Amino acid sequence: MSQTHFGFQQVDEQEKAGKVAGVFHSVASKYDVMNDLMSGGLHRVWKMFTIAQAAVRPGYKVLDIAGGTGDLAKAFARQAGPTGEVWLTDINESMLRVGRDRLLDAGVLTPTALCDAEHIPFPNAYFDVVTVAFGLRNMTHKDRALAEMRRVVKPGGKVMVLEFSKVWQPLEKAYDVYSFKVLPWLGSKVAGDPESYRYLAESIRMHPDQETLKQMMEQAGLDSVEYFNLTAGVVALHVGRRL
């Protein structure tokens, strides 16, 4: 059986899916609070930048993969309006439930679905925009997921990946201390779960850097791939098009 990484561990591919699911079942109820604490609220700025780059218009069809608690889907649904179609999807039932409830509380009615990004249950060339924010690094076969995103986006449409990336080199040591000391401590104090947040820090380090992810998106069949470094490369937004 093929091996893959779960944080810094090597595990069977089938085992990884269960382990990742366990992490997000555990953190779902505290996910938004922890995001604010871990990023100092910057995750909201990164998402606002992504929303601006997506440039969703009335009538657009948008797929938000690994949409979690629904920040992007909520904004897209308001932009696409009643003639549009915005799907909030996630492979994790606990995260999807939190996201669906948050959308309802905000008065946003949009469809939700459990969705494995490696097997997206939508037809070819269906969406104008496909997004995944802070989800790609948890996927076992990133190449398959990217190919599926390319498949379901329309010609001329965008595939957008917002993800933690390779930080500017002078900041690496400080960033390591924060990631491997502060994050697990916050996870313990706020969520009672240091191990899940240790995994999140490790998964960031194992994720491809900016140029490698750009090449992966190109290999998946996307064109005109570019990326934007945010907060000194702590996060990068990659954007590719299907021509």
Curated annotation (Swiss-Prot):
GO MF, one example: 2-methoxy-6-polyprenyl-1,4-benzoquinol methyltransferase activity
HAMAP family: MenG_UbiE_methyltr (MF_01813)
Annotated source species: Ralstonia pickettii (strain 12J)
Stored CDD domains: AdoMet_MTases
Methyltransferase listed as a keyword: yes
A family per Pfam: Ubie_methyltran
Enzyme class label: transferase
Name listed for the protein in its UniProt record: Ubiquinone/menaquinone biosynthesis C-methyltransferase UbiE
Protein keywords: Menaquinone biosynthesis, Methyltransferase, S-adenosyl-L-methionine, Transferase, Ubiquinone biosynthesis
